[in-house]
Regions:
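Long C-terminal interaction/binding lobes of large macromolecular proteins
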Residues: 2-14, 18-21, 25-411
Length: 411
C-alpha cells in the first residue's frame, strides 16, 4: 500500500555520509560504504525538527506525539474504519498549537540524539491517551449521528513516535526556533521537570544485520519487523534490541510462485461465544456448506495479514483466509523467491482479533451488543508464508480463490 511519509535525515555511523530515510524505514543501507544496519529503540523513535537558531540560542524542545494507524469501530451493524494520521501536543501548557500542521512534511527531521544540545521536555501524556482523545472527538460525532456509542473500537497503530519542536527564550518571550517569531510570553513555558539532555531510552541503537549463526547478510524490506537468513533458514526478530530467532512456516509453492505473502496464523481461545471448532466457525459465519462431522474436532485458527494494506483489504483477506482454514503441509525452509516483508507486528494482529471476529459474524444484531462480553485471545501464533502467483495486475492463490491487486502492495 503506497503511503505518504515524512523524511528523516541522518549520517552513516560508519562513513559519515548523509542518508535520507522515510519515517517508517527500519533498515538502513548506506549508498557510499554499503553498510546495512537495523534501527532499534527501547521505547519509541524520537525526532527533532530543525532549528534555524540552533547555533546561537539555548534551545528548548517541546514534545508532540505523532501517530498513524487505523481506528476500527463496530457500529449497528457493520465494521467501519477511519485512517488516523495526526500529531498532538504532549505538553500541558498551551504555548504552542495543538498540532504541528504541515511542518514535518515541509522540513527534514533528524533523529533525536545526545549530539543535539538543549533542554528536552518530557511528554505529559502517553501515546495511548493522545490517540484516545482523537478517537473520542470522532466518536462523539458518530455517537450523535448514530444515537449510541460503538459496540467496540480498536486502534491498530502503524507507528507512534515523538517529535520535538524547538523554541527558545528571548526578551522574556517564547520564540519559534524554526521561524524566529514570538509565540507567547516566557511565563507560559514551564520546564522545571524537564531533563537537561536527551534520555538514553529515547535514542536509537543500530543493530548488525549479519546472521548470528552463519554470518550471512540478513534479508528484509525497508520497513521489515523481521529479518531472514536464506542460508540457515532462520527468522530473526530485532524487537528486543538483539536478534532473537522466531518461528515461521512456509506453505511450499507449486510451479511459479513469484511472491510469498506473510500471515499470522493464530490459534484462538474464545469466551462468550461458542467458537471451539471449525464447525462452530462455519455456523457463526453461516458458510454455504454442509457441516462435516470432522469439523467438530477441528481447531479454529484466525489468519491475519502480517503486512500493512488498506483497512478494507485487511479485513477481507483475514476473513477469506480464516473461513478457508488452509491445511496444507508446511515446512520451515525459506523458498528461493520473493518474501514480502513482515510489517504488521504480532501484537497488532492480536489486538485486531475481535474486529475480525465481528466482521465475519453473520448474525450481527445478535452478537454485536454482546461484544464487550466476548473475549478472544491468541493461544499460539505462527508466522506463515503463503505462495501467490502473478496473473497480470493481480496476485492470486488459485486453490484458495484469493486475489489482490499488485498495486496494493509495494512490489
Amino acid at each position: 500500500m503506497k503511503r505518504l511519509s515524512w523524511d528523516i535525515e541522518l549520517r552513516c555511523s560508519q562513513c559519515g555520509a548523509p542518508i535520507s530515510l522515510e519515517e517508517t524505514d527500519r533498515l538502513l543501507i548506506c549508498s557510499y560504504c554499503h553498510v546495512k544496519l537495523y534501527l532499534w529503540t527501547p521505547s519509541q523513535f524520537c525526532y527533532c525538527l530543525p532549528a534555524l537558531k540552533a547555533s546561537s540560542e539555548n534551545l528548548i524542545f517541546i514534545p508532540y506525539w505523532r501517530f498513524k494507524g487505523v481506528a476500527y469501530s463496530v457500529i449497528p451493524f457493520e465494521v467501519r474504519h477511519r485512517i488516523l494520521d495526526a500529531t498532538r501536543l504532549a505538553y500541558s501548557h498551551r504555548v504552542l498549537p495543538v498540532t504541528l500542521g504541515i511542518r514535518p512534511q515541509a522540513l527534514k527531521m533528524r533523529f533525536a540524539s545526545g549530539e543535539i544540545q538543549g533542554t528536552f521536555i518530557k511528554p505529559q501524556m502517553s501515546l495511548q491517551e493522545a490517540v484516545m482523545r482523537i478517537q473520542n472527538q470522532f466518536e462523539e460525532l458518530e455517537g450523535v449521528l448514530l444515537s449510541r456509542p460503538p459496540f467496540h473500537r480498536e486502534f491498530i497503530g502503524e507507528l507512534g513516535s515523538l517529535i520535538f519542536f524547538p523554541v527558545f527564550i528571548r526578551n522574556r518571550a517564547v520564540v519559534d526556533g524554526i521561524l524566529g517569531k514570538v509565540i507567547g510570553p516566557e511565563k507560559d513555558l514551564v520546564i522545571d521537570e524537564a531533563p537537561s539532555g536527551m534520555p538514553d531510552h529515547w535514542q536509537i541503537k543500530p543493530l548488525s544485520t549479519l546472521c548470528p549463526n552463519c554470518g550471512n547478510t540478513l534479508q528484509g524490506g525497508r520497513e521489515s519487523l523481521l529479518l531472514f537468513c536464506t542460508v540457515c533458514h532462520v527468522a530473526w526478530n530485532p524487537s528486543s534490541g538483539s536478534l532473537v530467532a522466531s518461528k515461521f512456516k512456509v506453505i511450499p509453492g507449486k510451479g511459479d510462485s513469484p511472491v510469498y505473502l506473510p500471515f499470522w496464523m493464530m490459534r484462538v481461545a474464545v469466551k462468550g461465544i461458542e467458537l471451539k471448532s471449525y464447525a462452530d466457525l462455519a455456523r457463526a459465519a453461516n458458510l454455504p456448506k454442509m457441516i462435516q462431522s470432522e469439523w467438530e474436532g477441528q481447531e479454529v485458527y484466525f489468519w491475519v495479514p502480517a503486512f500493512r494494506v488498506h483497512p478494507s483489504l485487511f479485513l477481507r483477506l483475514s476473513k477469506q483466509m480464516t473461513l478457508f482454514q488452509p491445511v496444507e503441509e508446511m515446512e520451515a525452509v525459506l523458498p528461493n523467491a520473493l518474501l514480502y516483508p513482515v510489517t504488521l507486528s504480532e501484537e497488532s494482529a492480536t489486538a485486531s482479533l475481535k474486529i475480525h471476529l465481528a466482521h465475519l459474524l453473520t448474525k450481527k444484531r445478535d452478537y454485536f451488543p454482546k461484544l464487550d462480553e466476548i473475549i478472544i485471545e491468541s493461544a499460539e501464533t505462527t508466522l506463515v508464508f503463503i505462495p501467490f502467483i502473478s496473473t497480470g495486475s493481480e496476485l492470486v492463490h488459485p486453490r484458495l480463490g484469493i486475489g489482490l491487486q499488485r498495486q496494493t502492495l509495494s512490489l
